[in-house]
Design a protein with these regions (language model features):
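Structural signature for solvent-exposed beta-strand/loop edge elements and short helix-capping sites
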Residues: 1-174
Length: 174
């Protein structure tokens, strides 16, 4: 598994955990979603301002095009593309996760907004909201799997993505 960021000028496509096959002889790269904890994390495209879920990306490095596709075992599956400014109340409520006594997106976004920083540590959330470290860690891993934050489990460093803040602001304005 590898985190991959494909640059195109100032823009990029990013995924936190994919399997990479590079064919140097033919200048081709195949990215496949790993089966680990980030299997549900979307790819992020800064050029289009979207997140998208797909099983594989295939890139012939001699061209400027990337093939994006999804397949299930039985048939083709859709590639889901979602604007970072999209808000759906039902989807947002599902991001509350199961087993949390708080809404993880609201918790991290509110902390980021109130402290005017998107980067902080898990311990900051534990202290501010008086939550158990294990509960905060589970919530942060959940949000990282959904592509809403970057989370370094070893250091506890959190970077809240603009999408998470947008979701919380949209929810509070509803």
């Amino acid at each position: 598994d590898a985190a991959v960021k494909i640059f195109h000028g100032k823009d990029s496509i990013f995924h936190p955990s994919v399997d990479v096959v590079f064919d140097a002889a033919n200048s081709r790269m195949l990215l496949s979603k790993s089966k680990g904890k980030f299997k549900d994390a979307p790819y992020a495209s800064t050029y289009f301002g979207v997140d998208f879920s797909a099983e594989r990306l295939r890139w012939d490095l001699k061209t400027d095009s990337i093939d994006i596709y999804s397949e299930s075992a039985a048939a083709q599956a859709p590639v889901v593309i979602e604007s970072r400014t999209h808000f759906n109340l039902s989807d947002f409520l599902l991001l509350g996760g199961a087993g949390f006594s708080f809404h993880p997106v609201v918790l991290v976004s509110t902390y980021a907004i109130e402290n005017r920083t998107n980067t902080f540590y898990a311990d900051d959330l534990v202290k501010k909201y008086k939550r158990k470290p294990g509960e905060i860690q589970m919530a942060l891993e959940f949000l990282a799997q959904k592509g809403l934050i970057d989370y370094d489990i070893k250091t506890g460093k959190v970077n809240v993505k603009e999408r998470a803040i947008h979701l919380t602001k949209s929810f509070k304005n509803k």
